[in-house]
Amino acid sequence: MEEATGKLEVITRYFADFSNQQINQFAELGRVYTAWNEKINVISRRDIDSLYEKHVLHSLAIAAIFKFSAGMNIIDIGTGGGFPGIPLAIFFPEVRFHLVDSIGKKLKVVNEVVNALQLKNVTTQHIRAEEIRNRQFDFVVSRAVAPLKDLWQWSKPLLNKERKMEAFKNGLICLKGGDLTQEIQESRLKPHSWEISALIKESFFSEKYLLYIPA
């Protein structure tokens, strides 16, 4: 636990005011992922030692801009190993997160992490985003899952219209990297965009972006 707590410094450098429970959850997160990644590879072997920077802190870039409020419902589509959903669920304990993925073995790891961290605000579902029916959420979050055009097509039916944040309408929030010029052009959308490197001063976040499309 002491080693994991030391690695948390890359998070606490940018985010403060965590409760003891949140600190313990973030620390335990590293231990559980490392153990399960030996059995089911949900995180690149070369990235597991950089888990807190490349996966946890990257996920929390969303929290640097969007201050979700208590009672909101967020869906993480194509959650993979649980990112960005699990770090955000720790960060926002009074917000409900629904994590979905089409690959069952990845959700097995997600469920083990959720149980180990005792995250009461997380549910999971083995399903493709486009197959979800009769459920709506305040925001959709996603990380490196699909082209923006597809993400938006999947997200639109999942977004309710009742606005719960003053600063932002309900919408899609996604983490992307690289040159997005062609992808954005092909989507015919005009997303709001933030350079993550302007928010988090770590070299890993060069050419990493946070995109937002309001419903």
Regions found by a protein language model. Give the residues of each.
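Active-site capping/gating segments
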Residues: 177-215
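Conserved beta-strand segments of alpha/beta enzyme cores
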Residues: 96, 121-123, 171, 192-195
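Class I SAM-dependent transferase core
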Residues: 1-70, 75, 105-108, 112-122
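Conserved SAM/SAH cofactor-binding pocket of Class I
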Residues: 60-142, 152
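A short, conserved alpha-helix within the catalytic core of class I
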Residues: 148-158
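A generic alpha-to-beta junction signature in SAM-dependent methyltransferases
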Residues: 66, 159, 163-166
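Conserved beta-strand signature within the Rossmann-like core of class I S-adenosyl-L-methionine
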Residues: 163-179
